[in-house]
Amino acid sequence: GKGRFSMAKPIALAADHGGFELKEAVKAHLEELGLEYIDFGTHSTDSVDYPDMAVPACDAVVSGQCEKALLFCGTGVGISMAANKIKGIRACCCSDSFSCEYTRRHNDANALCMGGRVVGPGLACQLVDIFLNTEFEGGRHEKRIAKLMAIENR
């Protein structure tokens, strides 16, 4: 149900033209859940470049303005590559519930990327629910995350 969801801060949304329609479907889902979001664009199906779309949304997560990011492109892969270049972002590209759950539990992912040409709106909304509701387990995973983040400082 609805009660599971409580975000201290808004969710950052961003997409290129290939992910625009899926972003809009997820946005409607967040509204149904009563969750706040900031839509960093794009706002149409006109062609834009996914790195340009990823950066402002991811910066909002890293700065603490937003809780997590939901990012969309044609496959989810390009925008995940862009997101993972941003210091402090741990982006996953998911199209199945198991990966989506465990990337939160074990990797403390803070950006979920999906492909508008890969994932339908129903599955996308399910994955968003899993992503937003699953807590990081910590424990043995803490040192692995620390090692992952240390790569950014080489």
Where are these predicted regions, by residue range?
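C-terminal binding/interaction regions
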Residues: 12-14, 18-19, 97-154
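Glycine-rich phosphate/diphosphate-binding loop of Rossmann-like nucleotide-binding domains
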Residues: 12-32
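Mid-chain, well-packed structural core segment of small domains
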Residues: 71-117
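Short, Lys/Arg-enriched N-terminal segments with co-localized hydrophobic residues
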Residues: 1-6
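Solvent-exposed alpha-helices and their adjacent loops that cap or buttress functional pockets
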Residues: 7, 61-65, 104-106
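A short beta-strand-loop structural module common to alpha/beta enzyme folds
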Residues: 36-47
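Short, structured active-site "lid" loops
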Residues: 53-71, 75
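Short active-site oxyanion
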Residues: 10-11, 66-69, 88-90
